[in-house]
Amino acid sequence: MKLAYWMYAGPAHIGTLRVATSFKNVHAIMHAPLGDDYFNVMRSMLERERDFTPVTTSIVDRHVLARGSQEKVVENITRKDKEELPDLILLTPTCTSSILQEDLQNFVDRAAMESKSDVLLADVNHYRVNELQAADRTLEQIVRFYIEKAQKQNNLSTTKTIKPSVNILGMFTLGFHNQHDCRELKILLNQLGITVNEVIPEGGSVLNLKNLPKAWFNIVPYREVGLMTAVYLEKEFQMPYVDITPMGIVQTESFIRQIANVLNSIDKTNSYNFDQYIDQQTIYVSQAAWFARSIDCQNLTNKKAVVFGDATHAVAMTKILVREMGIRVACAGTYCQHDADWFREQVWGFCDEVLITDDHTQVGDMIARIEPSAIFGTQMERHVGKRLDIPCGVISAPVHIQNFPLGYRPFLGYEGTNQIADLVYNSFTLGMEDHLLEIFGGHDSKEVITKSLSTDSELNWTIEATSELNKIPGFVRGKVKRNTEKFARQNKIITISIDVMYAAKESAGA
């Protein structure tokens, strides 16, 4: 446990609640003190949904500490069972309430005797895993519970569908453009002649989990959530899974070819070949392939970028920038420390350096040191970019309200390639455009600010030096200002004049 004002991945109970609230007609009971119950507010604020967040907090207060929690927890479970009539009630402690070391499984067993709903305790170690790991584990636990229940009742659907079908695993609430991605995946699969059997957990019903084995194979679009479920289904029912993220032209092609391989391995009577579909989509539907060869994109060649986010999106974005757009990635990083080995393996050869950390200050310092032309990261990197006056495109959760758009903005599939191309192009500040804006806008309206993460500055610029600085084109002015101030600090100069600017230029070898 640590105190922080920004966390990339939250505590474990947030992941569990995200999975529970993604399913339809599932209610979550959170055994927690006041202060841990911010999930309701966060989800209600960010997700564009009409329904209330189905989470009830069983508050740990002084009365509970004096008498024990059992009576209150069991009462909350049975009350919600009568009021909401859910299919499943999921009980989760938080890292704070876990300190009490109570036998919550005993509470669940007792409540289950009095409830019509299924009651389940989230099997997550709240001290050892983060939000994403807990979400992955909780999804697998719920799927396993309902499949084993169906096996006992002898009503498990294991007969495969006549036409090729698929389950999409890992779409869930508060994910990065997950609902748009799901829609785009459905369109892509439909065009390939593949029906979607189930999508879980987003919008799915726990009562339909017994139908998962009917599908021919599974798709896991994001590594962070769904992989454990796919591995479980493969082990139990020999269901293959595709875990390539179809983000960017190259990976979307690999994704479709992998699907063809899976279908050919299952159905020996038919031959599945999607080459013609790939060619048509790449040439006519996706504008990204054409855009990558245009003069606009060639202007971005060898521009420096920094990428940071969850493992799935950071890897995909790094490969898109380098392979498809010719942009140099100075540093690729992720906050998914549990997936560090896979991340390093994937970005090897695509970037100059790798940063794996969940400390936002290290990421901010790295960006300030590299001084990229653009950043592609989370909401935090957007804040860092604003302070350093470096444009930032948001490509990964955690994100704020502007990345839960009402319009259709997928990042996966061929329509996703268009969105990414727009995001990349619009994120870079184009030199001539910036210069023209300043010429016609006038320099008196544009104030030059210090480009560093620290806001205090003991340096003074003379009027002449400021005027000279304003004559420098905007797209390199920030670098000149930082180099001059760095030179001044090294030489203990307090007032920066034109002479100091030229001396700094000489020392930099420019």
UniProtKB/Swiss-Prot annotation:
User: Which amino acid positions bind [4Fe-4S] cluster, per UniProt?
Assistant: D36
* Cysteine disulfide partners in this protein: none
Q: What is its main location?
A: plastid
Cofactor binding summary note: Binds 1 [4Fe-4S] cluster per heterodimer. The cluster is bound at the heterodimer interface by residues from both subunits.
Q: Which InterPro entries match?
A: ChlB/BchB/BchZ (IPR050152), LI-POR_suB-like_C (IPR013580), Nase/OxRdtase_comp1 (IPR000510), P-CP_red_C (IPR042298), Protochl_reductB (IPR005969), Protochlorophyllide_Rdtase (IPR016209)
Top enzyme class: oxidoreductase
- Tell me the cofactors it needs: [4Fe-4S] cluster
Name its pathway: Porphyrin-containing compound metabolism; chlorophyll biosynthesis (light-independent)
Q: Name one GO biological process term.
A: photosynthesis, dark reaction
**Molecular-function GO term, any one:** metal ion binding
Positions binding substrate in this chain are G431, M432
Catalytic activity, reaction form: chlorophyllide a + oxidized 2[4Fe-4S]-[ferredoxin] + 2 ADP + 2 phosphate = protochlorophyllide a + reduced 2[4Fe-4S]-[ferredoxin] + 2 ATP + 2 H2O
Cellular component, GO annotation? chloroplast
Keywords noted in UniProt: 4Fe-4S, ATP-binding, Chlorophyll biosynthesis, Chloroplast, Iron, Iron-sulfur, Metal-binding, Nucleotide-binding, Oxidoreductase, Photosynthesis, Plastid
Origin: domain of life: Eukaryota
EC number(s): the record gives 1.3.7.7
Localization of this protein? Plastid, Chloroplast
Q: Name one Pfam family in it.
A: Oxidored_nitro
- The active site of this protein is located at D296
| Task performed by this protein | Component of the dark-operative protochlorophyllide reductase (DPOR) that uses Mg-ATP and reduced ferredoxin to reduce ring D of protochlorophyllide (Pchlide) to form chlorophyllide a (Chlide). This reaction is light-independent. The NB-protein (ChlN-ChlB) is the catalytic component of the complex.
Family per UniProt?
Answer: Belongs to the ChlB/BchB/BchZ family.
Give the quaternary structure.
Protochlorophyllide reductase is composed of three subunits; ChlL, ChlN and ChlB. Forms a heterotetramer of two ChlB and two ChlN subunits.
What protein am I looking at? Answer: Light-independent protochlorophyllide reductase subunit B
